[in-house]
Amino acid sequence: MTKYFRHFWWAWPFLALKIFIFYWQTDRLDMMNVYEVPVLTVLFLFGLFEICSMGRGKASRWIFYICYTVITLVMFADAAYSSYFGRYISVNQIYQLTSLGQIAGDGNVIGAAVSPGCVLTLIDYPFVLYFYRLRQKGGEALATMSMRRFVPYVGVHALLLLAMVCVWYYYGCNPYNLRSVQKVNHIEFFTYHTNDILVNVLGRLRRGEVDEDAILKTMEELVPRSSGKEYKGVAKGKNLILIQTESLNDFVIGAEYNGQELTPNLNALLKEDTFYFNHFYSTTGVGNTSDAEFAALNGLYPNDVRECYRLYVDNTFQGLPWILRGEGYGAYAFHGYTKTFWNREEAYKTQGFQHFYSQEELTMTEVSGFGLTDKEMFRQAVDILKEKPQPFFSFIITLTNHIPYELDPSLASLVLRPEDEGTTFGGYLQTIRYTDEAFGKLIEYLKEAGLYEDTMIVIYGDHQGMNMETPSVKSSMSRFLGKEYNFDEMLNVPLIIHIPGLGEAETIDTVGGQVDILPTIMNLMDVEPGHPFIFGHDLLNADEGFVAQISYIGKGSFITGDNNMLFAIGKDGTVESGSVWDLRNGEKMNRNNALCQQYSDRATALLDTCKEVLDYNLIAEYVTH
């Protein structure tokens, strides 16, 4: 028996090390004051080891091997996902493996996005399996135990199993819907994934009826409002080119580096016939780039379940492509990568695009990094568009400024400082400069094709390019900005609306997000959506600015212009452990819990209500295609 327990103690340090590394790599060590978290993880992990050790046969051994392998892989996935998105992975993300597989060939993409420290979650694996085998061999079989030893041995293990089941049910299932339990479920590994499966798998099976009137009432109360008709129809009848720019952060606009303008062409654009929104924020869900598209095209929030291009591929939509087709426009999409990425090939059909030009159809004359270079994309797009009947709507997604920001040296024009050579930060500035040059070329191509004067150009960033969760990036960015780099800068992407002949240039500081692009464009083009389910508002006539957040800082986070603050909810899902930044100077603010709770509830309700609209395909009741 002494030998039996000795093998258990040998395994203990490695199990404890696994728990420590996991919560360290997912940045949750500071939440261990919620005592249930370490207690529950220890109970489940040590309990699994102990109970499986009771058996002496191959079945027990393989049950443990399989269970521990799954736990280890999920912990690794959680650590990797959290290092970029700040949250654990969900069962819904299993569907993203197809997209991951498409970019896995470029290890630099994944390497730049994921913290190398995640590999440490695997370090215990061979040792625990080895000591488990010794434990199993060194123990006494139940059949040979005396009754005096058998009864307490089995009794203790039965109580351990009962405790595991009861605790798992209470915390993982949360039958009484307690807030204190929800807090634990945001942090603790086993109960988070139990709750995630229950909510996202079983929850769909229990879906009931929807109250459309209640949804419309909620929208009336919570969706930010716009009043007035300023600039209505100033772009009516014009062609529309909507450009989603990969990883374009707002901090590069007007900035200089090493005595060089980072975005000279965009800077020039802002001086004439342009609206520039400098407090504009990404509203991506778990679909990241594809969800940015979804929000911009439809005025709908993505969600934290799954990328909308897959989850709602069979829904009926009435976004920009369908609205403008109803006005006699042609609708075309361009992307210099494979057409199946993010399920675009299928999703674009329901979005209303008549043709999707991807790498399978474009000429891959110049490739750098992730796909067709931006200059070549713009050149080929204009060549195609000038042959199309007018007016047209063109949606273009750029690619050159994609992580890991590796630009062919022949295309690089920015002179980097020695300390920034070979870094993610330096690479980002280099590709940003190239993308800006591409915008200059786009204007030239449009003028040469005779399209410029009759075309409204809308440019926005899809999501952050510099992830503050990466220590080296945060350090470089803080040095560049002259202040600590935080979420207020990271989530800030530009929105630029250029209308030749507008006759004015204005910087607008109204807080907005990608859900506001559709209603803002509708006002400028004087068109209507034909349904009431628009969750954004016209930023040119906004009464207030409010944006709900999903990814990176978590559901329940928000950005509001009324109080000039960005609020990031705590990783335990509570307002009390959240953080607040002042949008005016980027400094941390004292948290007003009551006010933050009010806004947080509003943000959550907006996301939940929008999800109901999508889950029940309510737009289909208003339109037919």
Q: PLM features: residue spans?
A:
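Transmembrane and membrane-interface helices of multi-pass
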Residues: T2-I197
